[in-house]
């Protein structure tokens, strides 16, 4: 296991930056590896506030040419003022987390021989440990051809119960549909940032509907 192609740890992650990453270029997941409750923090590369729009400011080319001429003339402050007032595009929107897949297992959190690892050759993340006679193992990976994150649960010398749930910080609802757990929701239509002062103010504007999303 202690091979250079593995990342491995002897305890679960306690914060997001310690979790193991998997992804396929579109879907991503961060795996914490707790014994009694596995959390996979999900994201999607297109889940942003706002909606498609042209961010190029009208007259920006002329403003750039004027600012460049002022800079070449040594008038740097005037050049900077024009860049800030007439050249810069609108503020970008906010990238959002999709939510959490939570797997709750039966039994206690007592364990031995715990290993949490990521195989850098196969991109498979795994969690394994012993609970009495049971040997528990989870394998997770993100498939690019199938566009899914897959979870495989294995138990040797026994059996187990698991409950799956989906959580999200956005406006959403979760329902069971055709054997699937489906989460659907809506992101804010705008995320405005006022960067003109030392203390930035943030507001959500929902005059237009934001992006709709579904996760199953």
Map each language-model feature to its residues.
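Aromatic-residue-lined binding/catalytic grooves and analogous aromatic/hydrophobic interfacial grooves
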Residues: 1-216
């Amino acid at each position: 296991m202690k091979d250079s192609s593995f990342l491995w740890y002897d305890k679960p992650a306690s914060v997001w930056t310690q979790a193991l990453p998997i992804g396929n270029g579109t879907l991503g997941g961060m795996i914490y590896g707790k014994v009694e409750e596995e959390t996979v923090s999900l994201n999607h590369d297109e889940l942003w506030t706002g909606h498609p729009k042209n961010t190029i400011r009208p007259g920006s080319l002329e403003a750039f040419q004027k600012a460049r001429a002022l800079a070449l003339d040594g008038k740097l402050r005037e050049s900077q003022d024009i860049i800030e007032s007439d050249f810069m595009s609108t503020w970008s929107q906010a990238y959002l987390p999709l939510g959490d897949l939570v797997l709750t297992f039966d039994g206690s959190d007592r364990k031995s021989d715990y290993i949490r690892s990521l195989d850098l050759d196969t991109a498979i993340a795994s969690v394994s440990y012993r609970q009495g006679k049971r040997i528990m193992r989870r394998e997770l990976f993100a498939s690019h051809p199938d566009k899914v994150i897959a979870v495989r649960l294995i138990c040797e010398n026994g059996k187990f119960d698991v409950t799956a749930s989906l959580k999200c910080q956005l406006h959403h609802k979760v329902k069971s549909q055709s054997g699937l757990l489906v989460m659907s929701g809506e992101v804010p239509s705008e995320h405005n940032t006022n960067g003109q002062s030392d203390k930035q103010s943030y507001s959500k504007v929902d005059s237009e509907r934001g992006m709709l999303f579904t996760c199953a």
